[in-house]
Amino acid sequence: MTAPTTTSPSSEATTTTTTTTLNTIATLHQSLTTETTPLPVRFRALFSLKHVAATHPATSAESLAAIDAIAAGFASPSALLKHELAYCLGQTANGAAIPYLTAVLEDTGEDAMCRHEAAEALGALGDVASLGVLKRFRDREGEEVVVTETCELAVERIEWENGEGKKAEKLRASDFSSVDPAPPTAQGQEEQTVEELGNALMDTSLPLFKRYRAMFALRDLASPPDLPTAVPAVLALAKGFADSSALFRHEIAFVFGQLAHPASIPALTEALSNTEEASMVRHEAAEALGSLGDEEGVEETLRKFLHDAEAVVRESVIVALDMAEYEKSNETEYALIPEAQGTA
């Protein structure tokens, strides 16, 4: 006689948890892809999906469903949302995102800001199989400069990640968990000073990858904000807004958003207020100011640009004001993550 099949309580609990998470993903998917959903809610849904994708095993049903849900958002007409989708996919450390990102990069009719973010995300994922497509668009005649430069960085990052250089280098411990377009400058026997890193940051004779490394080294010297090097590092970074590369300038604004240091407010305000500045820089400056929303005068500055001529700037201000409200609230997590799943 065949013994009856039994299911252990632990496997039943796992199945129930998986089902609950998949149901949550479906709800978040709906919020993310519904154009009538307020943009801040869609962003919070996106960050929740990124959390699920990054905190579950890469081949799990939950992680794959979350990545599929994020990628479904690429059908949106919002360049701001699509570029954020690409960034989030690059932060998942999951190769399942690569086909979606490759498709965005290869779509020459797509907004250059989205394609740049897709290339950067491929670099963050670090798969050598992506080198071919990245080199193709790095070298493509007539390509948008922002895409060319990003592909150059992504190729260098993947080669560094998979080469001997990474193994031999000693990197300063960072307060930031993000996978960046370049690692910080490696530490030598003596740590480089803010002045030395600032000089490297602005040295246009250096490869872009090395300048980015100086940028992220300066970022790490500015956190926590009470470090003696923090304000000097922020001021050194702010000089990067004078660079000729819009990609470089936008990355300075992104770093300021990570740092949320009050000393960056004047430079960010100037970048946002300059209507001659590239929209990808202004939008990043707006979002960075959103991370400083509890500082005096920041919300008033942002509200001035709610009706900006550039859609990506207008939308960024909406999201930034939502972030500012979060900064002033008692909420512990910006994303819409159910309590049962924990927080990042």
Curated annotation (Swiss-Prot):
Positions contributing to Fe cation 1 binding: H83, E84, H116, E117
SUPFAM superfamilies per UniProt: ARM repeat
EC number: 1.14.99.29
A cellular component annotation (GO) from this entry: nucleus
HEAT-like PBS-type repeats: 81-107, 115-140, 210-240, 248-274, 281-308
Broadest EC class assigned to this enzyme: oxidoreductase
Functional summary from the UniProt entry: Catalyzes the hydroxylation of the N(6)-(4-aminobutyl)-L-lysine intermediate to form hypusine, an essential post-translational modification only found in mature eIF-5A factor.
Protein name: Deoxyhypusine hydroxylase
Gene giving rise to this polypeptide: LIA1
